[in-house]
A protein has these predicted regions:
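Active-site proximal loop and beta-alpha junction motif in alpha/beta enzyme cores
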Residues: 1-166
Protein backbone atom coordinates (compact mmCIF):
# COMPACT_ATOMS: atom_id res chain seq x y z
CA UNK A 1 0.00 0.00 0.00
CA UNK A 2 0.98 3.65 -0.24
CA UNK A 3 1.09 3.91 3.56
CA UNK A 4 3.54 1.01 3.89
CA UNK A 5 5.67 2.49 1.10
CA UNK A 6 5.89 5.91 2.80
CA UNK A 7 6.62 4.37 6.22
CA UNK A 8 9.31 2.09 4.75
CA UNK A 9 10.93 5.00 2.93
CA UNK A 10 10.95 7.15 6.08
CA UNK A 11 12.63 4.35 8.04
CA UNK A 12 15.07 3.37 5.29
CA UNK A 13 13.56 -0.13 5.04
CA UNK A 14 12.31 -2.31 2.20
CA UNK A 15 8.50 -2.43 2.03
CA UNK A 16 8.67 -6.23 2.27
CA UNK A 17 10.13 -5.96 5.79
CA UNK A 18 6.85 -4.40 6.94
CA UNK A 19 4.45 -6.34 4.69
CA UNK A 20 5.90 -9.73 5.73
CA UNK A 21 4.59 -9.25 9.29
CA UNK A 22 0.91 -9.29 8.22
CA UNK A 23 0.33 -6.72 10.98
CA UNK A 24 -0.96 -3.18 10.39
CA UNK A 25 0.85 0.12 10.79
CA UNK A 26 -1.26 1.96 13.39
CA UNK A 27 -1.25 4.89 15.78
CA UNK A 28 -1.64 3.63 19.35
CA UNK A 29 -1.56 5.50 22.63
CA UNK A 30 -1.43 5.09 26.38
CA UNK A 31 -1.22 8.86 26.73
CA UNK A 32 1.45 9.60 24.12
CA UNK A 33 0.32 8.76 20.55
CA UNK A 34 2.96 6.80 18.63
CA UNK A 35 3.02 5.25 15.17
CA UNK A 36 3.53 1.51 15.66
CA UNK A 37 5.42 -0.09 12.76
CA UNK A 38 5.87 -3.89 12.61
CA UNK A 39 9.15 -5.12 11.08
CA UNK A 40 9.82 -8.73 10.08
CA UNK A 41 13.28 -9.32 11.54
CA UNK A 42 15.70 -8.06 14.14
CA UNK A 43 18.33 -7.60 11.41
CA UNK A 44 15.98 -5.33 9.45
CA UNK A 45 15.07 -3.37 12.58
CA UNK A 46 18.77 -2.79 13.34
CA UNK A 47 19.38 -1.81 9.70
CA UNK A 48 16.72 0.94 9.81
CA UNK A 49 18.20 4.35 9.01
CA UNK A 50 15.46 6.94 9.52
CA UNK A 51 15.12 9.95 7.27
CA UNK A 52 13.99 12.52 9.80
CA UNK A 53 12.40 14.94 7.34
CA UNK A 54 10.23 12.13 6.00
CA UNK A 55 9.43 10.98 9.56
CA UNK A 56 8.26 14.49 10.40
CA UNK A 57 5.95 14.50 7.37
CA UNK A 58 4.71 11.02 8.24
CA UNK A 59 3.82 11.90 11.82
CA UNK A 60 2.29 15.34 11.17
CA UNK A 61 -0.82 13.91 9.54
CA UNK A 62 -1.30 11.28 12.22
CA UNK A 63 -1.10 13.25 15.49
CA UNK A 64 1.71 10.97 16.65
CA UNK A 65 4.90 12.11 18.37
CA UNK A 66 7.27 9.32 17.39
CA UNK A 67 7.66 6.15 15.36
CA UNK A 68 7.96 2.96 17.38
CA UNK A 69 9.23 0.20 15.09
CA UNK A 70 9.27 -3.32 16.49
CA UNK A 71 9.86 -6.95 15.68
CA UNK A 72 8.76 -10.05 17.55
CA UNK A 73 12.26 -11.46 16.96
CA UNK A 74 14.15 -10.71 20.17
CA UNK A 75 17.56 -10.95 21.80
CA UNK A 76 16.17 -12.56 24.97
CA UNK A 77 13.78 -15.53 24.83
CA UNK A 78 11.58 -14.06 27.58
CA UNK A 79 10.92 -10.82 25.65
CA UNK A 80 7.80 -10.26 23.58
CA UNK A 81 9.30 -7.72 21.18
CA UNK A 82 12.37 -5.67 20.35
CA UNK A 83 11.72 -2.02 19.52
CA UNK A 84 13.38 1.19 18.37
CA UNK A 85 11.92 4.66 18.94
CA UNK A 86 12.50 7.55 16.54
CA UNK A 87 11.31 11.10 17.13
CA UNK A 88 11.27 13.84 14.52
CA UNK A 89 14.25 15.73 15.93
CA UNK A 90 16.75 13.11 14.85
CA UNK A 91 19.37 13.92 17.45
CA UNK A 92 19.38 10.60 19.32
CA UNK A 93 17.29 7.47 19.21
CA UNK A 94 15.13 7.18 22.32
CA UNK A 95 16.64 4.27 24.34
CA UNK A 96 13.73 3.57 26.70
CA UNK A 97 10.31 4.94 25.74
CA UNK A 98 7.93 3.61 28.39
CA UNK A 99 4.73 5.17 27.05
CA UNK A 100 5.55 3.87 23.57
CA UNK A 101 6.18 0.37 24.96
CA UNK A 102 2.79 0.50 26.67
CA UNK A 103 1.16 1.46 23.38
CA UNK A 104 2.98 -1.42 21.65
CA UNK A 105 1.80 -3.86 24.32
CA UNK A 106 -1.81 -2.73 23.82
CA UNK A 107 -1.33 -3.04 20.03
CA UNK A 108 0.05 -6.60 20.35
CA UNK A 109 -2.86 -7.67 22.56
CA UNK A 110 -5.55 -5.97 20.46
CA UNK A 111 -4.20 -7.55 17.25
CA UNK A 112 -3.82 -11.01 18.86
CA UNK A 113 -0.12 -10.96 18.03
CA UNK A 114 0.66 -12.55 21.42
CA UNK A 115 -1.00 -15.10 23.68
CA UNK A 116 -3.60 -13.10 25.57
CA UNK A 117 -4.41 -13.60 29.28
CA UNK A 118 -6.57 -11.54 31.66
CA UNK A 119 -3.24 -9.89 32.59
CA UNK A 120 -0.77 -10.20 29.73
CA UNK A 121 2.84 -9.49 30.73
CA UNK A 122 5.07 -8.40 27.84
CA UNK A 123 8.73 -7.44 28.32
CA UNK A 124 9.85 -5.10 25.52
CA UNK A 125 13.56 -4.75 24.63
CA UNK A 126 14.83 -1.36 23.50
CA UNK A 127 17.99 0.75 23.33
CA UNK A 128 20.40 -1.92 22.05
CA UNK A 129 21.04 -0.04 18.79
CA UNK A 130 22.41 2.93 20.77
CA UNK A 131 24.31 0.85 23.37
CA UNK A 132 21.81 1.72 26.11
CA UNK A 133 19.85 -1.52 26.46
CA UNK A 134 16.68 -1.48 28.50
CA UNK A 135 13.79 -3.78 29.18
CA UNK A 136 10.40 -2.18 29.62
CA UNK A 137 7.97 -4.42 31.46
CA UNK A 138 4.37 -3.99 30.42
CA UNK A 139 1.13 -5.47 31.69
CA UNK A 140 -2.08 -5.29 29.69
CA UNK A 141 -5.19 -5.88 31.81
CA UNK A 142 -8.35 -7.16 30.13
CA UNK A 143 -11.95 -7.38 31.26
CA UNK A 144 -14.42 -9.16 28.96
CA UNK A 145 -11.94 -8.86 26.10
CA UNK A 146 -11.52 -5.08 26.50
CA UNK A 147 -8.26 -3.44 27.56
CA UNK A 148 -8.90 -1.71 30.88
CA UNK A 149 -5.39 -0.79 31.97
CA UNK A 150 -1.80 -0.79 30.74
CA UNK A 151 1.06 -0.64 33.27
CA UNK A 152 4.73 0.00 32.46
CA UNK A 153 7.98 -0.25 34.41
CA UNK A 154 11.60 -0.55 33.27
CA UNK A 155 15.09 -1.79 33.89
CA UNK A 156 17.54 0.56 32.18
CA UNK A 157 21.22 1.44 32.01
CA UNK A 158 22.21 4.40 34.18
CA UNK A 159 24.11 6.94 32.11
CA UNK A 160 24.44 9.63 34.72
CA UNK A 161 23.19 11.03 37.96
CA UNK A 162 23.18 14.36 39.66
CA UNK A 163 22.02 16.40 42.58
CA UNK A 164 20.13 19.65 42.58
CA UNK A 165 20.06 21.93 45.60
CA UNK A 166 17.67 24.82 45.82
Amino acid sequence: TDEVASVAEALGLAEEEIQATNQPVRVASTGLPVLIVPVATLAALFAARPRYGLLRDLLEGRDATLVYAFTKETKEARSAAHARAFDTVGSVEVPGAGAAAGALAAYLVSHNAVTVQPVTVLPIEQGHAVNRPSTIYTEVHLDSGEITRVVMGARVVRVGEGRLEI
